Amino acid sequence: MRADFLEGVKAGFPSPAEDIHEKLDLIRLLVRHRASTFFFRVDGVSMVDAGMDEGDIIIVDRSVDPYNNCKAVCYIDGEYTVKRVEIGENSARLMPANEHNSTYKPIEVTPENNFIIWGVVTWVIKKM
């Protein structure tokens, strides 16, 4: 998808036609590795303080190596979830980001869990 890309947003009475800088290809901007990038719609409110609201679209890249405190889609015991991942030397903990709702608790990953970090969140797309 390509759209006009405007350099600045003026607070007065601008002429948008004068400010067209180039064509913006959203896929080129948002997707670095096509074969390993996936789009998900957020279902739930456990990550609102991380900027992921219900209904947002997250872009997840499976080729990005997970790192401590990354936001990632994880598979744990038959379910997918998006959380902030605390990665220790021999441990992992999935952290919600919603301080206003005590329903969401950290998930301690143990050797008994069927667990993988499926992919790292690289972008969040919101409707305003």
Q: Residues of each region from the PLM?
A:
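PDZ-domain C-terminal substructure recognizer with occasional recognition of PDZ-binding tails
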Residues: 81-108
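Short beta-alpha junctions and helix-cap segments that line functional grooves
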Residues: 69-72, 106
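Short, positionally conserved secondary-structure boundary motifs
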Residues: 1-48, 79-80, 87-93, 114-115, ...
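Short, charged beta-turn/beta-strand-edge "cap" motif at the junction between a beta-strand
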Residues: 63-66, 78-79
